[in-house]
C-alpha cells in the first residue's frame, strides 16, 4: 500500500510561502526543483569509480560503474518502460485508461508497473508460474495484474497468453520490449549521452550484459556518434554463447542471453 501511495502521489504545498533555513521564499522557486512524480526521477543516475577493484588487479585504467539501481523502481528498465509507453502515446496506439499487456518476469515489469500506475493505465503482466512469490507480490503492490502461465512452457507460453489477452481486450496494447525500437532508443538518447557527458567524453570502453540487447545497442550508438573508436563489449554467459553462434543453454544469470535474437 505504501508503494502504491508513493507511485500515485503528487507533492502538495498549502502555503504561499515556505520557510527554508529561516528565509521565506516563493513556492515556485522551491517547486521548480521538486519532482511531481517518479517518472521525473528516471535517469541521470550517478557514476562511481571502482578504485579498489582497479588497485586489486593492478589495472592502469579507471573502471566506472553506472548505478542504474538509483532509478525510482530500481533498475535500468525504468528507462525502457517509460520510453515505450511515451512512444505508444505519441503514436496514438495507447489511449487514456487503456490496458497494457507485457510478457515479462523481470525488471521491465517492475518499471512498467510504476509508470502505468502513474499514468493511469491498467497493466497485465503474463509470466511463468515458476516466478517467485516475492516478485509477484512486488508487482501487485505497484498496481499490476498478474496472469500466470504454465511453467513448462516458459516465456513462450507467457508471450502466447499476452497475445490472447490483447485480442480479447478492446484497445489493449502489447509493448513487447524484445521488438520495440524504443528500447534501444531510450538508451541512445539518455543512458549513452549521460555516460559521455559525465565522463567528459573520456570513456573508451563500454561493457554491458545482453538480454534484449537494448542497453548495449543504444549506448553504443550514442557513444560512437561522439567517438567511433569507443570499444563496446557485449557480455553473455559462457555456457550460453548465443551471440557467438553457439547454442542457448541453461545458466544462472537472470536477464541475460534471452534467445530472442
Question: Where in this protein do the model-derived segments appear?
Answer:
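PLP-dependent amino-acid enzyme catalytic core
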Residues: 30-259
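Single conserved hydrophobic/aromatic residue that forms the stacking wall/gate
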Residues: 1-15, 259-260
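Acidic/proline-rich low-complexity IDRs
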Residues: 2-5, 25, 58
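Sequence-pattern detector for short linear motifs
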Residues: 7, 25, 80-82
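Short, Lys/Arg-enriched N-terminal segments with co-localized hydrophobic residues
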Residues: 9-10, 14-30
Amino acid at each position: 500500500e505504501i508503494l502504491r501511495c508513493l507511485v500515485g502521489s503528487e507533492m502538495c504545498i498549502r502555503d504561499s510561502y515556505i520557510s527554508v533555513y529561516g528565509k521565506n521564499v516563493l513556492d515556485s522557486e522551491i517547486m521548480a526543483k521538486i519532482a511531481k512524480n517518479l517518472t521525473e526521477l528516471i535517469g541521470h543516475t550517478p557514476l562511481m569509480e571502482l578504485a579498489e577493484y582497479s588497485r586489486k588487479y593492478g589495472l592502469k585504467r579507471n573502471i566506472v560503474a553506472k548505478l542504474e539501481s538509483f532509478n525510482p523502481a530500481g533498475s535500468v528498465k525504468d528507462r525502457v518502460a517509460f520510453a515505450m509507453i511515451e512512444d505508444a502515446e505519441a503514436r496514438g496506439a495507447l489511449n487514456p485508461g487503456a490496458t497494457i499487456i507485457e510478457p515479462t518476469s523481470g525488471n521491465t515489469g517492475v518499471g512498467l508497473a510504476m509508470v502505468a500506475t502513474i499514468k493511469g493505465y491498467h497493466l497485465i503482466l503474463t509470466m511463468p508460474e515458476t516466478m517467485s512469490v516475492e516478485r509477484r507480490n512486488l508487482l501487485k503492490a505497484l498496481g499490476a495484474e498478474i496472469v500466470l502461465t504454465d511453467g513448462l512452457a516458459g516465456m513462450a507460453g507467457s508471450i502466447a497468453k499476452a497475445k490472447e489477452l490483447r485480442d480479447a481486450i478492446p484497445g489493449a496494447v502489447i509493448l513487447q520490449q524484445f521488438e520495440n525500437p524504443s528500447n534501444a532508443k531510450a538508451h541512445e538518447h539518455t543512458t549513452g549521452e549521460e555516460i559521455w557527458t559525465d565522463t567528459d567524453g573520456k570513456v573508451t570502453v563500454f561493457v554491458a550484459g545482453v538480454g534484449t540487447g537494448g542497453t548495449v545497442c543504444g549506448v553504443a550508438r550514442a557513444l560512437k556518434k561522439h567517438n567511433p573508436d569507443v570499444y563496446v563489449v557485449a557480455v553473455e554467459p559462457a555456457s550460453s554463447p548465443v551471440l557467438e553462434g553457439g547454442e542457448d543453454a541453461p545458466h544462472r544469470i537472470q536477464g541475460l542471453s534471452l534467445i530472442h535474437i
